[in-house]
Amino acid sequence: MFFLFHDRLKIKINMKILLVDGNEKEASDRYIKMGMDTQFEVYKKILKKKSKDSVKITLIHPAVQDEYLPAGVSLDDFDAVVWTGSLLNIYDHNKSIIKQIDLAKELLNRKNKIFGSCWGLQVLVTAAGGKVRKNPKGLEAILAKNINLSEQGIVHPMYKNKNKKQ
């Protein structure tokens, strides 16, 4: 997961990063409805914090928009690409997924450095010709409720401005 590896990211000053949101609009809307940040907002905050706001981030939503690159922008304009997580599954192969695989194929043929976690890895592996299979034991994601934060948890940035009891 991104949180486990973000301390190892090498982010340069004035780096141009393409942030690819892997979710469909409905999934992002669900995060917002629950009072959470969307996947792309979490990534954006981490990248800005890691770089001390010295990066230029361009956010795109290929699962939502047909024309997702801003006018006059090329994939070659970026030093790096960061691909977010998503509630999608690569083996479902719907239009949103196929568009993202096609984008990944384009990016793999360019000079960009690419970081993907969870969903981003599924897309990149598939685009590179690899196979991703469904876990026979079911979904590995876990939802936790009624969490009582320790003193360390209370001061952790992930829980900033949140209730002590989650």
Predicted regions: what they are:
Residues 86-90, 118, 122, 131-132, ...:
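Gly/Ser/Thr-rich beta-alpha loop segments that engage phosphate groups in nucleotides
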Residues 92-95, 126-128, 136:
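Short, conserved acidic/polar surface loops in the N-terminal third of protein domains
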